[in-house]
Amino acid sequence: MYASKLKKGDEIRIVSPATSMSILSNEAKIQAKTALERLGYRVTIAEHANECNEFDSSSIESRVHDLHAAFFDPGVKAILTTLGGFNSNQLLRYLDYEKIKRHPKILCGYSDITALCNAIYQKTGLVTYSGPHFSTFAMKKGLDYTEEYFLSCCASDDPFEIHPSSEWSDDRWFLDQENRRFYPNNGPVVIQEGYAEGTLIGGNLCTLNLLQGTEYFPETEHTILLIEDDYMSDIHMFDRDLQSLIHLPAFSHVKAILIGRFQKASNVSIDLVKAMIETKKELSGIPIIANINAGHTSPIATFPIGGTCRIEAISGTSRIWIDKH
C-alpha cells in the first residue's frame, strides 16, 4: 500500500518520535522549515514535538498522540520526523495500526526511525521511507542531492535510478554551516556480483535488530536488505549485528544487501567490509553493494521500505533502481 504522493501546497507535519525538537537551534528550525516551504509545502509542528525530558525525548503518551494526530488528520499528507535518537521502539505496541492502515500517509526518517518505518510496514503494509529528517533540511550546503531523491520517492510515482552523488561529507555541519568539508565520491563498491529484484526492507542496522523476535520485524521473503550504521558502530559491532540477522531462519530469503557509507570515526574501510563478508558463507551467491548514499553521512537518497528495488552488480560496476515507491 502506497500513500498519495506529495503535491505543491500539501501539509507536512513534523513529529518527534525519538529525540525532542527542543535540541535544535531556532536557526536550524527556521532553516529547515524555509527549505521545505521553498519546495512548495506547508509545514506544521506536532503539539508535543518540543517537549523534553531527562532523556532528551518526551513521554510515550505524547509521542503516540502526535503520531496518531498526524496520521488521522485529513489535511496532513506527509510526516517528517525531527531527528533520530534511541527510543522510538517504545511506541510500537501503542500505535493503532488498523487506523493507520485506513489513513495512509508518507512517513519519512532514518536512524532510530528505522524501528517505526519497518514496524508500520510490517503491521499495515504501508510503504514508509528511509530518508531525511526535518532537521536534515536545515543544511545550507550539500542538500541538493538529498532533496532530489526525497522528491523522486515522495512526490512522484515514476521509477528512478539512484545515482551516486559527486561528493559527500561527514562533518558536524549542524555546528558550523559555513566551513563544510566535502570529499569526492568514488561511488558504490561491488562486494559480490549478481542481479536481484525484491522488496526493500531495513535501514539502520542496530535499530532493525531491536525488532528481532517481535511481531514488528518485516518479512524477509524476496527482499533486498538495506543496512547502515553510525560512527559508534565499528567493524566488530557491524559484523556481529549483521551475523545476528543472518541467524534468523528466514534470512535465506534475502536476495541482496545494500550497505550505506560508513562514517570516518567508525574506522570501517571497504577492505574491512570485504573481509567481513568473506567470513559469511551464508551470503555466498547474493549481490552486495557497499558505500551507497544511505545513513549517517550526507547526502542521502530516500529508500521506500516495502517498495520494489532492483540492483545489478556486474564487472565491478553497479546500478540501483527503485521501481515502485
From Swiss-Prot:
The keyword Hydrolase applies. One of its GO terms (cellular component) is cytosol. It holds the Pfam family Peptidase_S66C. GO terms for biological process: proteolysis. GO terms for molecular function: carboxypeptidase activity; serine-type peptidase activity. The active site is at 111 (nucleophile), 228 (charge relay system), 296 (charge relay system). Its EC number is 3.4.16.-. It comes from the Bacteria. The keyword Protease applies. Keywords: Carboxypeptidase, Hydrolase, Protease, Serine protease. InterPro entries: Carboxypeptidase_A_C_sf, Class_I_gatase-like, LdcA_N, Peptidase_S66_N, Peptidase_S66C, S66_fam. PANTHER family: CARBOXYPEPTIDASE YOCD-RELATED (PTHR30237:SF6), MURAMOYLTETRAPEPTIDE CARBOXYPEPTIDASE (PTHR30237). Belongs to the peptidase S66 family. This is Putative carboxypeptidase YocD. It comes from Bacillus subtilis (strain 168). The lineage of its organism: Bacteria, Bacillati, Bacillota, Bacilli, Bacillales.
